[in-house]
Amino acid sequence: MNDATRDENGHPAPSQPTRAGTVEAWDIARIMHAIPHRFPFLMVDRVIGVERDVSCVGVKNVSINEHYFQGHFPSMAVMPGVLIIESMAQTAAVLVVATLGDDAAGKLVYFMSVEGAKFRKPVVPGDQMHVHVRKERRRGNIWKFSAEAKVDGKVVAEASYAAMILDR
């Protein structure tokens, strides 16, 4: 890759699609370049693997310093299920950007629906949650995904959902 296809940190620019069949890791700077979410709502700390048009694995390090633990719940901190789902959606947004490459410029990924959400085990401070997202299908600007969140290799949550890719 030449310098024109790298960002200011020397990483492959998110506007460049990954080659089909290759798996890439993304650091937080590259994630923040790709999706608009910021503290306190950025729910992906790292991507350990993204395969264009197929799947993405994101990582969320769950810390007691997360703002939501002040109220959920003070005596027994548990990551809210809706934020686990949000982590899945943000990981899917990374997959969309990796897949679309330059065509992702000026687009946003809008969460449309969630189905079959199941929460198997609480996610607590100190956990490292791995979010596995797979693209199930794409029709025009509507994408469907399935996802599992895992801690220590065990499924803690799962869901299927749809997103719409629209201009900003």
Question: In which residue ranges do the predicted regions lie?
Answer:
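Mixed-charge, low-complexity intrinsically disordered regions
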Residues: M1-I35, R46-I48, H72-V78
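Terminal leader/tail segments of proteins
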Residues: N2, I48, V54-S63, F69, ...
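Hydrophobic beta-strand-centered segment that forms part of the acyl-chain substrate-binding groove
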Residues: N2-A4, Q16-A25, A92-H130, V156-E158, ...
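Catalytic strand-loop segment that frames the active site of acyl-thioester-processing enzymes
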Residues: F39-M79, I84
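Hydrophobic beta-sheet segments that form the core/acyl-binding groove
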Residues: V47, S113-D152
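Hydrophobic small-molecule pocket/channel-lining residues, especially in calycin-type beta-barrels
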Residues: I64, A77, K150, K154-E158
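Helix-adjacent hinge/juxtasegments
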Residues: G71-D103
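Short beta-strand edge segments in extracellular beta-sheet folds
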Residues: K150, A162-L166
